[in-house]
Amino acid sequence: MSAEQKQGGTELAPRYDAKLVEDEYYQYWMDGGFYRAPIVEGKQPYTIVIPPPNVTGTLHLGHALNNTMIDILIRWKRMQGHPTLYLPGTDHAGLATQIRVEEDLRKSGGPTRHELGREAFVAKVWDWKERYHATITSQLRKLGVSVDWSREAFTMDERLSRAVRAFFVQLYKKGLIYQGTRITHWCPKDQTALSDIEVEYEERQGHMWHFRYPLADGSGSIVIATTRPETMLGDTAVAVNPEDERYKHLVGKMLRHPATGREIPIIADEYVDPAFGTGCVKITPFHDPNDFEIGLRHGLEMPQVIGPKGEMTEAAGKYAGLDRYECRRRIVADAEAEGWLVKVEEHQHAVGCCARCGTVIEPLISRQWYVKMKPLAEPAIRAVESGQIKIVPERFTKVYLHWMENIQDWCISRQIWWGHRIPVWYCDDCGHLTVSETDPTRCEKCGSANIRQDEDALDTWFSSALWPFSTLGWPDDTADLRYFFPTDVLVTGYDILFFWVARMIFSSLELTGKIPFHTVVLHGLVRDAQGRKMSKSLGNGVDPIDVIDQYGTDALRFMLVTGSSPGNDIRFHTERVENARNFANKLWNASRFVLMNLADWQPAAEGAALQYDVADRWIRHRFNEAARAVNELLGEYQYGEAARTIYDFIWSEFCDWYIELVKPRLYNPADPTRAAAQETLARVLEGTLRLLHPFMPYITEAIWQKLPLRSPQVETAPEIARAAGRDALPPSISVTAYPTPVEGWADAEANERMALIIDTIRALRSIRAEFRLGEHTRIDAVVMATSDQALAILNEGRAFIENLGKTGQLTIQPVAEAKPKNAAAAVVTGAEIYVPLGGLIDLPKEIERLTKELTTTGDELAKLEKKLSNEGFLTKAKPEVVEKTREEAAALAEKRQALENRLAMLRSMQG
């Protein structure tokens, strides 16, 4: 659609059709090239890279929140005149994607990964990637994100793959990558090693079994306790604390293992806590990380009794071939039958599970590749401690520093096929390892062609760690890298602070010598209305596209940000999306009204003398205040507060007050202030659309295109046009200047005057509602001013009060001792308001009605108070249920007080 078509006509459709507008305008933005990021020498760029969605599937509400938050910042900064890059892309998500494809093959009855072979299986995963990449990019477009698609990246693109190899080789040459045989977390289902942070710990109810181990010489026995009886088949010692007086005399003696019959020694090690359990700890070096370290210190044997699939090995003797859990059951049964089971206790403990598939992990000794973390962590710690990198909210700084200060070496090898294959080649002739950025054909040491590449792939986070600079061309010295790096802000979920954020920081400092971004903004998770995590098992997941199809993109975006605050989870409520949709409709209808009343209007020439009244001056002042607040709040990453500020300005001040206040002037062609009202409406609406645009881009663009008034484009607009390969840039609100307070619009006096007028109207409306006086019933009112200044203001606003207060006879006078009789009263700053009720209500009937309502309210409150005084309810009910009950009780108490006050007033009138 051309710019001319967009500008045609000034009339909006009777109703807002979100789907029609969204489909047309995203294509319009793409055709216009508005979001191509220009390189403008001398201009400070603003860059944010997308946290790349995994190609495992489709986007969820968390992605919608994340990309909305980023897009708000990007649109804001673009409108401030910065050359702005929002860089999109996707992540190959090695293990997670491989799992999904294997599941897909299994469900379809296809061959297994191993039946296919590596090359054919990887081809299947590429097909999967293409399919879901297309879905993800389509979803991002639906969300209206203003990314530069010409710079889109994928973590396994040729360019990014080269960066990954360069990273590996550089760290290897510096001695920061090594191959070691250590105990690692192993997933029996996915058949791969995992890093520490890929293990999630779940609190589970289990058992603690106590077994008797007899001394080999028959002189007695000791008791050990374990939660994993199956591992005892790999015991090679029992350890006690060297200072534990109970067992000092036994150190060095031999035990006869009750399950295997082998003799094992009693050893002394300071690791053992004498106060825990019996003070005796069985040592199984192959299957426990702490036992592994003890085994190394004492030179113990390390038999493997559990295999990589979770099955018992030949070393498990008669239990060989059993599943680990079946083995547990058999051992406990044998112990009970043979008399060496002492007791069984209920025991709650943390169980490590694979973060990808949920399988209970198995600690196993294996040879893996590791990154030496201490030298990399130190500069990453300094960058945050010194304030070079700021984490928002600040409380996560301590979390980051604690993890980095206690960081363990990073296991980076994975026994999978999808991903970046480790760039190491083994020579079968001389045993040398060739580590290279390019595929070698011969061993670099002996020249043999008999070399083979390491079978494993790198942890997916190894490539993601390079995302802020590999996407811009690193390791090459590109124009994009020089101009757009370091990036500015990273917006992401707090749940990947360690997985991703920390790794980007130390990788960037190591490879580029620069921080990757100056600010990290962390947001929470999107939960369901009950506060539960969304999951397939609960069936409470929400597809953002379903929400968009029903309510529109702008409504979803606005709901997500108004419910958010940095670092905190948000709850998804359909009602709140409906409220956001209603807000969009309110804006559309108000804009339609404004446009219909601008048909005969021409913008005033600069310096023209228009007769602005107090309402005009007030709304301009309120606009300035809103613009100032929103800019400050966005600068502090307070998206929710910024959005709510705009909402309040548009809904309440502009629509509910200003438009209603100016209607009589608009409807009267002879009114000398009509032109000023039109000028104010046009300019405030145009500025308001620009203020709201980063939050609700579609509806603001659609309305703005119809305005007979345009703000100038930002300075970088011509450069954006050139970046898009165009001679000129067609108009779009997204490349106009973001509002700041307008010079000459500040008017504290008008603000103060209108505050009294509005408070007076609100008081009249409140009395009308309180006494159920019909909306169309004209009510007489006496307004007593408490000062000469207030009297002047109220007289100036008489027409406003009469019109919006729907008064009959309105008396405005100085405050007097004699008050109107039989009148409802209200007090505001600067005035007392009285509404005589004679003839408006049947006093006895109203007293009877309110008395009944007071009794009912009191009974309901008593029930809730009884519930809240019940300890059983307070301790057993869910916290959210208790909180809701408290809120209901507080509301009823407030209602009771209001009813009592109203009854007292009516009874005093009754005499």
UniProtKB/Swiss-Prot annotation:
Its EC number is 6.1.1.9. Keywords: Aminoacyl-tRNA synthetase, ATP-binding, Coiled coil, Cytoplasm, Ligase, Nucleotide-binding, Protein biosynthesis. Pfam families: Anticodon_1, tRNA-synt_1, Val_tRNA-synt_C. It is found in: Cytoplasm. It is an enzyme of class 6 (ligase). SUPFAM superfamilies: Anticodon-binding domain of a subclass of class I aminoacyl-tRNA synthetases, Nucleotidylyl transferase, tRNA-binding arm, ValRS/IleRS/LeuRS editing domain. A motif ('KMSKS' region) lies at residues 533-537. One of its GO terms (cellular component) is cytosol. ATP binds at residue 536. This is Valine--tRNA ligase. InterPro entries: aa-tRNA-synth_I_CS (IPR001412), aa-tRNA-synth_Ia (IPR002300), Anticodon_Ia_Val (IPR033705), M/V/L/I-tRNA-synth_anticd-bd (IPR013155), Rossmann-like_a/b/a_fold (IPR014729), tRNA-bd_arm (IPR010978), tRNAsynth_Ia_anticodon-bd (IPR009080), Val-tRNA_synth_C_sf (IPR037118). Gene3D superfamilies: HUPs (3.40.50.620), Isoleucyl-tRNA Synthetase, Domain 1 (1.10.730.10), Valyl-tRNA synthetase, C-terminal domain (1.10.287.380), Valyl/Leucyl/Isoleucyl-tRNA synthetase, editing domain (3.90.740.10). One of its GO terms (biological process) is valyl-tRNA aminoacylation. Belongs to the class-I aminoacyl-tRNA synthetase family. ValS type 1 subfamily. A motif ('HIGH' region) lies at residues 53-63. The keyword Nucleus does not apply. GO terms for molecular function: aminoacyl-tRNA deacylase activity; ATP binding; valine-tRNA ligase activity. Its main location: cytoplasm. It comes from Symbiobacterium thermophilum (strain DSM 24528 / JCM 14929 / IAM 14863 / T). ValRS has two distinct active sites: one for aminoacylation and one for editing. The misactivated threonine is translocated from the active site to the editing site. CDD domains: Anticodon_Ia_Val, ValRS_core. Monomer. The lineage of its organism: Bacteria, Bacillati, Bacillota, Clostridia, Eubacteriales.
